[in-house]
């Protein structure tokens, strides 16, 4: 349980809504240290429970020994860590962010899998990320992020790779976001744009920046 409490603690300050539910279980060589919120809305809570079950089932499938491995008595001791952040952007708009990390044979994976889900509290229903995006959403996010990461410490000295391609509007990195009181929060995976020492990188873009109209570059008239 100490491991679970330590893992969950890093997300506590970003839990704006929901009562944390802790699951600490062990089955044979697999352990589960899970935390998720109870919101108090029947259908949303049922969906959250379903998401946690899906994550758990995928973990089980990955680490359950095959028949061959069972014969050879090979198995991997594994722990599933699950933590969350929850953001209330407006009165009824909830963004729920799950963080999933695996530990195998005592080694903590350097990768954290991040999933974001959106809910309308008034309608007690899940909503799609697409329904929350304006036409210029990805373009504005791309322009702001590229400028921010290439001009701001400590990011400008760490960004690597072909970041213009990686941060292009259609590259998929702006499909995963949370809506907060301050703006749109994007998560960039460890090792994606920066060295591993940066960890998971978060960037909140103010709503005013996300709503700007982007002018198309003017075509220059060739000189005769």
Locations of the language-model features?
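Compositionally biased intrinsically disordered regions enriched in Thr/Gly
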Residues: 1-224
């Amino acid at each position: 349980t100490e491991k679970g409490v330590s893992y969950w603690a890093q997300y506590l300050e970003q839990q704006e809504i929901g009562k944390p539910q802790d699951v600490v279980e062990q089955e044979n060589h697999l352990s589960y240290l899970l935390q998720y919120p109870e919101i108090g809305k029947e259908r949303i809570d049922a969906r959250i429970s379903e998401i946690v079950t899906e994550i758990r089932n995928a973990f089980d499938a990955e680490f359950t020994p095959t028949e061959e491995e069972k014969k050879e008595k090979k198995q991997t001791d594994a722990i599933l860590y699950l933590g969350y952040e929850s953001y209330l952007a407006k009165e009824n708009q909830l963004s729920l962010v799950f963080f999933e990390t695996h530990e195998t044979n005592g080694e903590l994976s350097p990768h954290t899998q991040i999933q974001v889900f959106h809910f309308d509290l008034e309608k007690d229903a899940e909503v799609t990320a697409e329904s929350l995006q304006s036409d210029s959403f990805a373009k504005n996010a791309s322009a702001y992020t590229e400028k921010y990461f290439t001009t701001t410490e400590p990011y400008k000295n760490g960004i690597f790779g072909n970041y213009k391609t990686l941060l292009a509007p259609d590259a998929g990195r702006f499909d995963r976001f949370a809506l907060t009181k301050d703006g749109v929060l994007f998560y960039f995976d460890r090792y994606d744009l920066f060295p591993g020492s940066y960890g998971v990188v978060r960037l909140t873009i103010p709503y005013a920046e996300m709503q700007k109209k982007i002018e198309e570059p003017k075509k220059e008239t060739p000189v005769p």
